């Protein structure tokens, strides 16, 4: 019986640590990216990363790849990969970037995902949105946790 409860405790501890980490990230925006069509997890991730590149190019300019310190940051999770796949993302950015993001994000997403849609919300309670986007996150589903490539590269230097 003790072995049966161990994975639950480990999963709960993992999720609690993710919630703490996401809360400390201090996100500004909570965005849900909906595909509204069948798509696999790899294609969903590639499309989301493409969106991030497009949005940062609009926010920062053509040299956005050479300016990782100016780029928007996010922590995202892929949810329901076998049925109604969508991505929840917590973004952190400057106030002006946040305003511009809200004005242009829908158009960029519609260009990338015909029939897809976004739900963009200002974060008022980081712990609450972190709790929500981690509801399916466990150690065995940690591959559904997405971070920007520029953050991975700069943290490994």
Q: Where in this protein do the model-derived segments appear?
A:
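Right-hand nucleic-acid polymerase module
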Residues: 1-85, 93-157
């Amino acid at each position: 019986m003790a072995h049966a409860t161990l994975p639950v405790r480990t999963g709960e501890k993992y999720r609690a640590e993710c919630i703490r980490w996401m809360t400390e990230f201090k996100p500004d925006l909570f965005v849900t990216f909906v595909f509204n069509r069948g798509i696999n997890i790899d294609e969903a991730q590639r499309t989301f990363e493409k969106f991030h590149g497009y949005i940062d190019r609009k926010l920062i300019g053509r040299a956005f790849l050479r300016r990782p310190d100016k780029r928007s940051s996010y922590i995202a999770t892929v949810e329901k990969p076998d049925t109604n796949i969508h991505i929840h993302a917590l973004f952190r950015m400057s106030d002006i970037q946040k305003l511009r993001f809200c004005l242009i994000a829908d158009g960029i997403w519609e260009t990338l995902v015909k029939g897809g849609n976004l739900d963009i919300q200002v974060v008022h309670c980081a712990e609450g949105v972190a709790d929500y986007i981690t509801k399916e996150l466990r150690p065995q589903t940690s591959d559904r946790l997405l971070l920007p490539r520029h953050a991975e590269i700069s943290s490994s230097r």
